[in-house]
């Protein structure tokens, strides 16, 4: 890839209840993201952080912090849209996973058939009716598919952003009942940890590449809780039995070799819950693999 990489920080923590994930972009930068990508030969521009207005935080009676989450994602969508218009590669740093609403709103308008790889322990397919918590970080994939609160679904004036047949979830091991029902009804492609253990990551990525081969762009949305908590402890909703560090690098390396990733976000790094920024460092190392770093 010869595009300029545009790094966008999104210090959003209002899509969930645990403080600290707003420091995720800083933790990833502190692990030398910009320097290490520059050392790989990339032109990197750091566009700073999207401002989050905390003075007007107000819990909607239906969804927690709806207005603030919506306002932040509107700004993010506009920033991502501009980066893509300039023919650059958007790399978004979270922040909780609700930021994917803005990333995809700014990205999908540039593609007729955008594919999405959702690398996550969770489905993030909840709605107000199915969510046990009301936290919007459990809803971004549903919202992007056109399901959920009207104001979120219609961000940037169009919906849906993506189609269920163009989504692959990798690493799922914690799904709510409503999410399981939607997956079965829609036929969405999901690789749970059972499939990853049985098939191996090489086969999973090979099948994913084949499945998304008709897409004209592919967005990677990587939640660090997709990894096992032993490898990525600094996340808000850890689930044991996750994808290993090495399996994750293999996945990123294969995606780079295929040349299909056109945008990416790395989310849910929470340095307050981390150990010596281990998860922030892991995020940087996975970005490097996604963008082509190899031993030889």
Swiss-Prot record:
Organism encoding this protein: Bacillus subtilis (strain 168)
A single cellular component GO annotation: cytoplasm
Catalytic reaction list: L-arginine + H2O = urea + L-ornithine
This protein's record includes keyword NADP: no
Function, in words: Involved in the catabolism of arginine.
Keyword terms, alphabetized: Arginine metabolism, Hydrolase, Manganese, Metal-binding
Protein name, per record: Arginase
Phylogenetic lineage: Bacteria, Bacillati, Bacillota, Bacilli, Bacillales
SUPFAM superfamilies, alphabetized: Arginase/deacetylase
Entry's induction text: Part of the rocDEF operon. Expression is sigma L dependent, induced by arginine, ornithine or proline.
NCBIfam families assigned to the protein according to its UniProt record, in alphabetical order: rocF_arginase (TIGR01229)
Binding sites annotated in the UniProt record for Mn(2+) 2: 120, 122, 223, 225
Required co-factors: Mn(2+)
Sample GO molecular function, one term: arginase activity
Pathway connected to this protein: Nitrogen metabolism; urea cycle; L-ornithine and urea from L-arginine: step 1/1
